[in-house]
Amino acid sequence: MPKSKRDKKVSLTKTAKKGLELKQNLIEELRKCVDTYKYLFIFSVANMRNSKLKDIRNAWKHSRMFFGKNKVMMVALGRSPSDEYKDNLHQVSKRLRGEVGLLFTNRTKEEVNEWFTKYTEMDYARAGNKAAFTVSLDPGPLEQFPHSMEPQLRQLGLPTALKRGVVTLLSDYEVCKEGDVLTPEQARVLKLFGYEMAEFKVTIKYMWDSQSGRFQQMGDDLPESASESTEESDSEDDD
């Protein structure tokens, strides 16, 4: 009896080796950027959206951005004065915790700060986000929805029915109150009705100067990285 292709064994050693190679490549890339660019900025991200971070990468093609893999970035830069790649880079590693990233650039502090201060994009809130404002729906026809959507709206909790083939809201309905922690159902309803509440924002927090080795704070402080147990994003590291 021929063996099924599904029975093919995968060598864990090969998988581990590939993962190690990827980490080593990232370490080399980071150190190359340290040697190439004048400035290194640490940024934090609110309401992370991969598509919007990609837009920023495209706008900053003259520079390099890394996001995620905090532990690997810490290894590349060094965690202490004794093993840091260049002077004061251990100060950068201390701040690599949570949804933060690195921007390597030759643009000045003023140029970077001005661009990112102005940049903001709205998107739909997700479950677990807080409602930015109260949303209430008035009764009446919901002509933006095809009749086939009515069962789904009802399942989400809306008091709807079909009247002459038109989806109709039968009574007032409060989707959420300002400050509510949104449920998956509330987030879905807000998206269906076009209410954007999540502000995607990148904030510059710190700067490291490669020529002087100076490390300085630019925004509100970030908590220092704890240890190996630091939770990190699985987002793509680089473009």
UniProtKB/Swiss-Prot annotation:
GO terms for biological process: nuclear-transcribed mRNA catabolic process; ribosomal large subunit assembly; ribosomal large subunit biogenesis; rRNA processing. Residues 215-239 are annotated as: Disordered. The modification Phosphoserine is found at S225, S229, S233. CDD domains: Ribosomal_P0_like. It comes from the Eukaryota. Keywords: Cytoplasm, Nucleus, Phosphoprotein, Ribosome biogenesis. InterPro entries: Mrt4 (IPR033867), Ribosomal_uL10 (IPR001790), Ribosomal_uL10-like_insert (IPR040637), Ribosomal_uL10-like_insert_sf (IPR043164), Ribosomal_uL10-like_sf (IPR043141), Ribosome_Assembly_uL10 (IPR051742). One of its GO terms (cellular component) is nucleolus. Component of the ribosome assembly machinery. Nuclear paralog of the ribosomal protein P0, it binds pre-60S subunits at an early stage of assembly in the nucleolus, and is replaced by P0 in cytoplasmic pre-60S subunits and mature 80S ribosomes. Associates with the pre-60S ribosomal particle. Interacts with MINAS-60 (product of an alternative open reading frame of RBM10). This is mRNA turnover protein 4 homolog. It comes from Homo sapiens. The lineage of its organism: Eukaryota, Metazoa, Chordata, Craniata, Vertebrata.
